[in-house]
C-alpha cells in the first residue's frame, strides 16, 4: 500500500490517531529539543523496526534463524566497543539496569553510586546505596575523597553514571578505587555512547566489569539497551536476562539495532560525533560570552549545564523556552554535600546536530537561552525569539541526510513523514536485506 493510501485509510478509520501523528510531526519539525535523551531515530533503523520482521520473535522463528540475528548484533556490539561479551536483548535502560544489579549483587549488598544513580531501578530489591558526586565548590569529582568513602563503606559495586557530568571521567582512577576495595565497577556511558563509539573520548570498556548504554538517543537506534561485560561474568548477566523474562525480543528490533551498530562503525558516524562535540563547545562558549554561568567549567562531551541568573526560577524559564519553541531539561545536580543541589538546565547538542545545525546555529540558540536565563525578557520579546527559532528551523529536517549512508543520501528526509524513506526501501527491499549486514 502506498503511503498516501495508508495515510488516507488511517485518517478515515482513526482520525484521533491520525491527528496525533500529524501534530507530533509538526511539533518535531517546528521546535528544537535540547533534552539529552531526545534524538531522531535513523530512518533506515526506523524502517527495519516497522518492517515485516516485526511478525517474528527470537522465540517463534525457525531453528537457528533468530540466533543468527542475535549473534550478528552481539558481534557488532563487541567489535564496535572492544568488549568481550555483549547482551543485546534488552528493551530499555531500566531493564538493563535491573539485570546488572541482579547479576552482580546479593540482597543487602552496599552500592557506591555517583549521584545515587540506578537506585531508581531498585524497586523491590534490597540494596544499601551510598552516594558520591562532584565537589559543590570545585564542581568536579575529587577521586581522593571517593577513595576514602569507598574504603569506609566497602561497597560490593561502584557505579558511575555521569548523566549530569559534562567532563571526561578519570576511568583509571575509578578502576583503582574499585580494585582497592574489591568491588565490581559498572559504568553507564548514557548519551556519551556516540563519543565513545567514535573514539572521541576515552572508553571505560577495558577497565569496567560492566558498561551499559541506551540504544536510542545518541546511537540513533531503536529504544533499548546494551550491556557490555567481561567474559568471566557473562554467565551471571545472561542468567539474569533469562530470569527477568527477556526471552522473546522481536527480530525487527534486533535488525534495527544491528543496523544502528553497523552505522556507528562508519566514518559518517565519527563525523557526526565530531560535530556533536563542536556544537556543544560552541553552545557553551556562546552562553558564557553572554554572561551565563556553566557548571563544571564548561564541557568536554555533548552536555552543557547552564545555570540561571540569581532570582530566575528554572521551571518558569523552561516553560518560557517551551513557548518559544525550545525544549530543555531542568535539573538539580547532586553534590558530595547532600544539602547542596546545583540548579541548571541540562542541555545537549545531540538532537540539533542530528537535524543538521552547526556552530553558527548554536550561537542563535545561545542568544535565546541567555535572554531567558538572565531573566531579561522585555515585553513582546518572547514573540521575537519564537520567530528567531522558527526561522532557524524552517529548512531543517528531523534527520539530516548529511548523516545518512551514501547509498541513501538521495532520500527526502525533510518530508512531513518518513513515507518516502519507506517507499524507497520497499523498492530496494531485496538488495537492502541482502547487503545490510555484510
Roles of regions detected by a PLM:
Residues 59-62, 248-251, 268-275, 287-298, ...:
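Flexible, glycine/charged-enriched surface loops at secondary-structure junctions
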Residues 45, 96, 249-256, 300, ...:
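Catalytic-loop motifs flanking and including active-site residues across diverse enzymes
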Residues 2-3, 13-15, 339-438:
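PLP-dependent enzyme catalytic core of the Aspartate aminotransferase-like
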Residues 64-291, 308, 349-350:
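Conserved PLP-enzyme active-site core in the AAT-like
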Residues 21-31, 39-64, 73-81:
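Glycine-rich phosphate-binding segment of PLP-dependent enzymes
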Residues 1-23:
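Charged, compositionally biased N-terminal leader segments and the immediate start
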Residues 293-359, 409-416:
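Conserved PLP-binding catalytic core of the aspartate aminotransferase-like
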Amino acid at each position: 500500500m502506498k503511503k498516501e493510501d495508508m495515510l488516507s485509510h488511517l485518517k478515515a478509520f482513526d482520525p484521533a490517531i491520525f491527528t496525533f501523528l500529524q501534530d507530533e510531526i509538526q511539533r518535531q519539525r517546528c521546535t528544537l529539543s535540547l533534552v539529552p535523551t531526545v534524538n531522531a531515530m535513523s530512518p533506515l533503523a526506523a524502517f527495519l523496526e516497522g518492517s515485516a520482521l516485526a511478525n517474528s520473535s527470537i522465540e517463534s522463528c525457525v531453528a537457528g534463524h533468530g540466533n543468527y540475528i542475535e549473534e550478528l548484533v552481539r558481534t557488532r556490539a563487541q567489535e564496535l566497543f572492544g568488549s568481550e561479551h555483549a547482551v543485546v536483548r534488552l528493551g530499555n535502560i531500566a531493564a538493563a539496569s535491573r539485570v546488572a544489579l541482579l547479576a552482580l549483587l546479593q540482597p543487602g549488598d552496599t552500592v557506591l553510586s555517583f549521584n545515587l544513580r540506578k537506585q531508581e531501578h531498585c524497586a523491590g530489591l534490597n540494596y544499601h546505596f551510598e552516594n558520591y558526586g562532584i565537589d559543590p565548590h570545585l564542581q568536579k569529582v575529587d577521586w581522593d575523597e571517593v577513595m576514602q568513602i569507598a574504603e569506609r563503606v566497602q561497597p560490593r559495586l561502584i557505579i558511575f553514571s555521569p548523566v549530569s557530568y559534562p567532563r571526561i571521567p578519570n576511568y583509571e582512577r575509578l578502576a583503582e578505587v574499585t580494585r582497592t576495595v574489591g568491588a565490581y565497577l559498572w559504568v553507564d556511558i548514557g548519551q556519551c555512547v556516540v563519543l565513545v563509539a567514535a573514539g572521541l573520548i576515552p572508553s571505560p570498556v577495558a577497565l569496567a566489569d560492566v558498561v551499559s548504554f541506551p540504544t536510542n538517543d545518541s546511537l540513533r537506534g531503536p529504544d533499548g539497551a546494551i550491556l557490555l561485560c567481561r567474559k568471566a561474568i557473562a554467565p551471571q548477566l545472561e542468567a539474569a536476562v533469562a530470569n527477568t523474562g527477556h526471552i522473546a525480543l522481536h527480530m525487527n528490533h534486533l535488525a534495527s539495532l544491528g543496523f544502528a551498530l553497523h552505522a556507528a562503525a562508519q566514518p559518517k558516524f565519527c563525523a557526526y560525533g565530531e560535530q556533536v562535540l563542536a556544537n556543544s563547545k560552541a553552545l557553551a562558549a556562546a552562553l558564557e560570552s553572554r554572561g551565563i554561568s556553566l557548571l563544571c567549567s564548561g564541557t568536554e562531551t555533548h552536555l552543557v549545564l547552564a545555570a540561571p541568573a540569581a532570582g530566575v526560577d528554572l521551571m518558569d524559564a523552561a516553560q518560557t523556552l517551551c513557548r518559544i519553541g525550545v525544549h530543555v531539561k531542568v535539573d538539580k545536580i547532586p553534590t558530595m554535600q547532600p544539602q547542596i543541589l546545583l540548579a541548571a538546565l541540562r542541555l545537549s547538542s545531540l538532537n540539533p546536530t542530528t537535524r543538521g545545525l552547526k556552530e553558527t546555529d548554536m550561537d542563535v540558540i545561545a542568544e535565546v537561552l541567555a535572554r531567558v536565563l538572565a531573566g531579561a525578557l522585555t515585553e513582546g520579546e518572547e514573540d521575537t525569539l519564537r520567530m528567531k527559532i522558527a526561522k532557524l528551523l524552517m529548512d531543517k529536517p528531523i534527520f539530516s541526510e548529511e548523516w545518512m549512508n551514501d547509498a541513501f543520501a538521495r532520500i527526502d528526509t525533510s518530508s512531513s513523514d518518513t513515507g518516502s524513506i519507506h517507499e524507497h526501501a520497499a523498492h530496494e527491499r531485496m538488495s537492502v536485506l541482502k547487503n545490510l549486514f555484510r
